[in-house]
Amino acid sequence: MIVGTGHIGSYIAYRLAKLGYKVCVFERRSRIGEATCCTGIIGKECFDRFPIVNNGVLIQASSAKFFSPSGKCLRLSKDTVQAYIVDRAGFDRALAQKAQEQGADYRLSARVHNINSRDNCVRVTVEHKGEAIDFEGRMAVISSGFGTSLTQRLGLGKIADFILGAQAEVNVRGLDEVEVYLGQGIAPGFFGWLVPTSAGKALAGLLSRRSPGSHLKNLLSSLLAQGKITSTETRIIHGGIPLSPLPKTYRDRVVVVGDAAGQVKPTTGGGVYYGLLCADIAAEVIYGALRSDDFSAKRMSYYERDWKRKLSRELQIGYWARKTYESLDDRQIEKIFDIIQANNIHEDVLQSPDFSFDWHGDSILRALKNKPLARMFGR
């Protein structure tokens, strides 16, 4: 049994249903892919590793512009495609359809209130049309995104550090690449974005500790004044994004995967690829448990051991970088721009064999080998 029909839940459902297991997926909303606060930027490595996710591509991306608080522009560009921009709602729906084609059963408008692990099964209590219904199965996967209360009820703790995001679809003029905006007056401690999705359309958004909606309205007003968008009248979607992992992501008969587990890049808040990598690990561990009929906490611990081996270094370096950037004021951000441009650090990082759209740790450490930049951070 799987809680959540996002890309994580549907990918695990697809993997297990394809192996012939009976899978039931619960979703509290009435439609799959509703109210997704995500830019839909997915790295090429993710597409190459998971061909099943190659759905709903809107645009290929090989460059991005970064703007300092004063408006200085730093353009990063590669000769090859680095990422794809997808329709996230359509992306989630396509994955769910693939899982259903393999036999997975999807229950919509079904809110999971409780998960109870027993010796011989796991019981899930679901509210559907005002009625509480119990379902029993051999395993449960929590992949319902950030903010679920199920993990605390199961004694797995809660995510300690998180941010808030706000995003809206806007009409644009002549936007052909991703733009990122830095500065305390735009997104304090974080960043804003303008991401093209189709002809004349884009997603504008930002991350912030507090009041992301208010900050986004200010950003939209600025973009309108610059002539980049045609109106500020739009519907704003909000969402929470974890910056740190869940203290524990397993127990007997239960694993937690994706945003619900905090498997997200602390640098950007992106969780599609890391979540899928962990979903792959979870599917393998669950398959082994089903074959051996061993759903003990010890068996489930292999999942946490393996995903941490894969991601811990990236999450630790990324979190350090995130907290360091969050402490900077606009003057310091401007100085970093100046140092990067004067020393051509961005080109050095881009041309390095260590450079990756999805793996930021090596690029961060490489950039810090530059002495003027290292001195800024006391290294």
Regions found by a protein language model. Give the residues of each.
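Redox-cofactor binding/interface segments in oxidoreductases and associated redox assembly factors
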Residues: 3, 142-143, 256
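Glycine-rich FAD pyrophosphate-binding loop
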Residues: 3-5, 14-37
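N-terminal Rossmann-fold NAD(P) dinucleotide-binding loop
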Residues: 9-10
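Predominantly flavin-linked oxidoreductase catalytic cores and closely associated redox partners
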Residues: 15, 98-233, 262
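Hydrophobic "anchor" residues on beta-strands that sit immediately upstream
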Residues: 23, 134, 255
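A conserved beta-strand/loop capping segment in the N-terminal third of enzymes
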Residues: 43-94
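FAD/FMN-dependent oxidoreductases across multiple families
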Residues: 114, 210-286, 290, 297
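C-terminal helical "tail/cap" subdomain of flavin- and related membrane-associated enzymes
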Residues: 287-379
